[in-house]
């Protein structure tokens, strides 16, 4: 069994006055780790437990690790659960509860819901992890005041999820939407999916760093070299924006080009779905106004019909790495 780490947040109230509150487990299943949290119906995480995602084992073994996380949290908190939700990467059949395909775990046609339900004797639900994160923000985070939203996460890739009127838009196959793989530049940079010119290849944090490294080669006097101690491998998104704040021209050019591409992709999403809000997640968003202000300006210039016809707010997601736990728990509400 995988090694477990647990954390109880602010204790739990086991008195009779708390018996009316309902509790749910949310599991965030990733390629390297599994996180499980108990969330109450008011959106408070009362406990979290996690373990590594084991390599080279069958799917049923990983599902057993998930079940053990839930069981251990129940023992530690003394709480009764109403249900369990799971956010899993890949193509999910939400009706049957099967993981049709997950490249990160090398899973095909895994009956996740059936197997987990047998071990926990609780209602179990599963959905795509990016969708689940969007649902978490909708219920408990920056999306609470909106009826419709699209969440775009800028990380290693570009993740996305859509919520309309409290319901996930999952598409015909249950895989959610892959907005990161809309093409914004024909014949452009090769994407991990095999196509060229994908949004992800230009707007992910990975893309920002790649663009900055390339620009550094053309300017040996750039402040970026000093900030990375002469080693480009130390570069990250924060350093790029730090250099921008210090007036570095190379960083300025990189961020301008990056926000141009990001704005193009975000505008495409707005023109296609007309949500009330675009939620942006990922570490890049910590750059604040130096990143968001030019992005919003560029998007507003491009929206079909203008902002008066289709006003959309662009805001930063607020739940961070816990969005998956919140959203997974919300599947069981």
Name these PLM-found stretches.
Residues 1-83, 93-96, 113-124, 136-146, ...:
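ATP-binding/phosphotransfer module of carbohydrate and carboxylate kinases, centering on a glycine-rich
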Residues 28, 85-89, 127, 151-157, ...:
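Short beta-strand segments
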Residues 32, 132, 156-159, 186:
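Conserved A3 ("GATE") glycine/threonine-rich loop of ANL adenylate-forming enzymes
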Residues 99-101:
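Acidic/polar, solvent-exposed loop segments in beta-strand-rich repeat domains
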Residues 103-105, 109, 125-131, 151-154, ...:
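Active-site nucleophile and cofactor-binding loops and adjacent substrate-binding regions
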Residues 122, 147-152, 156-160, 164, ...:
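Generic beta-strand structural signal
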Residues 175-178:
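Structural signature of FAD isoalloxazine-binding scaffolds in flavoprotein oxidoreductases
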